[in-house]
Amino acid sequence: AGMTSTVFAQSDDFTTWTKFKVNYKIDPRFSLLSNLEFRTKDDVSRMDRLGLAIGGEYRAYSFLKLEAGYETHFRNLGDSEWKFRHRYNFGATASFQYQWLKIVLRERFQQTFDRGDSKARLRSRLKLAYAPEKGIVSPYFSIEIYQSLDDAPFWRADRMRYRPGVEIALAKRWALDVFYCYQYESPKGKHIAGVEI
């Protein structure tokens, strides 16, 4: 057992994710979304990827939002080799609140194209947050399951993310999100320190 735990500990990586978001509200129901993201890897010693995303969000009901978007990633493969990959996604997010507890359920389909290959995944996320009527600080915890839609058995988790964090409202439509995320994707895990603004 000791040997097994040592192997897993050695395979874990420590990384950072930093995301800058710009959202533009066209009308009460429709918003344009964009973000720029930087990720590191190998114990924060190297750049992992630079990502750019654009998309749209439509509030169908007070509790339901529909989304669609496109992303491109410039990824570091090592040995001075970088490559682009492309991804599109669409999904739905349902939000419910009872007193101070906010519950958010999101289902997202994504397909990634990488040098002629494609990979389709379904991402299911549950988020629980403390959301008081007054106050700007909202701690939360989320769990996200990635399921492969290609040749893997559907009910096998391809990747798992566990993410505690704190959102701080800086202005009416501007918030700071500071989080820790543990990602497990066989055979190794990732410890991620992140900031989104």
Feature-to-residue mapping (PLM):
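Transmembrane beta-strands of outer-membrane beta-barrel pores
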Residues: L36-D42, Y70-N76, F96-W100, F109-F113, ...
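Repeated loop/turn-to-beta-strand initiation elements of outer-membrane beta-barrel proteins
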Residues: R29-S34, F63-A68, Y98-I103, K134-S138, ...
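Solvent-exposed loop/turn segments connecting transmembrane beta-strands
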Residues: A9-T16, T40-R49, L77-K83, F113-A120, ...
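Start-of-domain marker
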Residues: Q10-E67, N76
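Detector for outer-membrane/organellar transmembrane beta-barrel domains
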Residues: A94, W100-Q147
